[in-house]
């Protein structure tokens, strides 16, 4: 699972004149890119995107024959890489005539338009290194049992992978991805959009259970989640999955809402996915912040969760209920019904003990004033004991964190 799974671009004279200036300096970060003549094996070890970047550098330097050699090596390793095939055609044509644009066609087909979009997305990825010393603001806290977290940045067609070492998160890799044909913010069945929110990988579907369209496998996520359902959003079947055998990668907006990776990248990703726990944060653009800001946000939300636990344990029902928002729902009851039930239940108890562990705290993307808390709840009282995995959605209401939704996860 390497960082190499990040970048490349293809194109012809007019398109490359702009793109290659932007990516040229960054290509030097690949040590092999400075070699006079890297071997095919060296290029393939660097990964498909890096191989294409090397070819583009050669095109910028007017080394058409060398670029063609690079591309042919890339195609030999990945014969179904359609973008590379298009670049090869451009390079062959460049020997005899100037090229106007990628694909060298003014009346481009839908496929050519898609490949041009992929080329632009690859350049954008190449230019957008994860900021050093910064982290996505969403991932406030992961339990030690959750080893990795995923954050999708749709603006850059990139899925970032972060590793949890028990004390902090570290960027380890990223992958080019395809999202829905109509962009983000899924609302209803069939709108061909990818949802924005906090989700989790809930199952694994092996290749044997799928058609070839989904490639090497699929990992469904829990869309619609509780917040989606509260807002009346519907639809189903949002997966992370691969590509058909005859397709290396797809344009940045080409799915029916799923998150699509190359089969090689999905195979790498599958090694670290934990069914039932790996969080997947999907956003339009990542908000990168300092570790100090994350710590402040984490402490603020952790304090709210702890105060809720303490007030529940105290059997002071009034104090306990002050932690719930005016528009609270558990899926069946609103705040008034919830209040009445809690007063009745707590009146019958002589003591309550509430323990929480394996706490996950995540800010909701696009909603600066909302967060998701998931934890193991160990409840014991004078007449009932149970243990459940609980999920709460917290919002800022009148300057304080309050619970908008609560239920079993």
Q: What does each of the following model-derived ranges do?
A:
Residues 55, 297-316, 323:
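Short, aromatic-enriched amphipathic alpha-helices that serve as compact interaction elements
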Residues 127-238, 244-249:
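Gly/Pro-biased beta-strand-loop elements
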Residues 203-306:
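Exported/periplasmic cell-wall-interacting domains
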Residues 386-409:
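Short beta-strand edge/turn micro-motifs at domain boundaries
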């Amino acid at each position: 699972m390497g960082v190499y799974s990040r970048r490349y671009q293809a194109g012809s004279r007019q398109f490359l004149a702009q793109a290659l200036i932007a990516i040229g300096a960054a290509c030097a970060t690949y040590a092999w890119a400075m070699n006079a003549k890297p071997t095919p094996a060296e290029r393939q070890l660097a990964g498909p995107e890096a191989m294409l970047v090397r070819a583009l550098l050669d095109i910028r330097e007017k080394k058409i024959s060398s670029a063609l050699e690079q591309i042919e090596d890339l195609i030999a390793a990945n014969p179904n890489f359609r973008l590379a095939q298009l670049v090869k055609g451009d390079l062959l044509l460049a020997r005899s005539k100037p090229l106007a644009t990628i694909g060298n066609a003014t009346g481009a087909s839908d496929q050519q338009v898609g490949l041009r979009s992929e080329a632009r997305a690859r350049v954008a990825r190449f230019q957008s290194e994860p900021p050093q010393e910064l982290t996505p603001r969403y991932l406030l806290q992961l339990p030690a049992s959750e080893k990795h977290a995923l954050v999708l940045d749709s603006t850059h067609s990139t899925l970032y992978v972060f590793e949890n070492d028990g004390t902090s998160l570290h960027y380890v890799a990223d992958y080019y991805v395809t999202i829905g044909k109509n962009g983000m913010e899924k609302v209803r069945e069939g709108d061909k959009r990818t949802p924005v929110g906090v989700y989790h990988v809930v199952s694994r579907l092996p290749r044997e259970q799928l058609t070839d369209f989904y490639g090497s496998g699929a990992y469904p996520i829990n869309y619609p989640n509780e917040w989606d359902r509260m807002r009346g959003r519907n639809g189903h079947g949002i997966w992370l999955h691969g590509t058909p055998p005859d397709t290396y990668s797809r344009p940045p907006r080409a799915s029916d809402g799923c998150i699509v990776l190359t089969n090689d990248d999905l195979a790498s990703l599958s090694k670290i996915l934990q069914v039932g726990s790996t969080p997947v944060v999907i956003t339009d653009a990542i908000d990168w912040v300092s570790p100090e800001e994350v710590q402040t946000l984490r402490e603020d939300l952790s304090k709210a969760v702890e105060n809720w636990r303490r007030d529940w344990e105290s059997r002071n029902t009034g104090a306990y209920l002050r932690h719930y928002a005016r528009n609270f729902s558990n899926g069946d009851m609103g705040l008034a019904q919830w209040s009445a039930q809690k007063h009745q239940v707590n009146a019958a108890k002589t003591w309550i003990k509430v323990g929480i562990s394996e706490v996950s705290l995540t800010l909701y993307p696009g909603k600066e004033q909302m967060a998701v808390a998931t934890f193991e709840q160990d409840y014991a009282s004078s007449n009932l004991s149970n243990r459940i995995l609980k999920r709460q959605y917290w919002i800022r209401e009148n300057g304080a964190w309050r619970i908008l939704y609560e239920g079993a996860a």
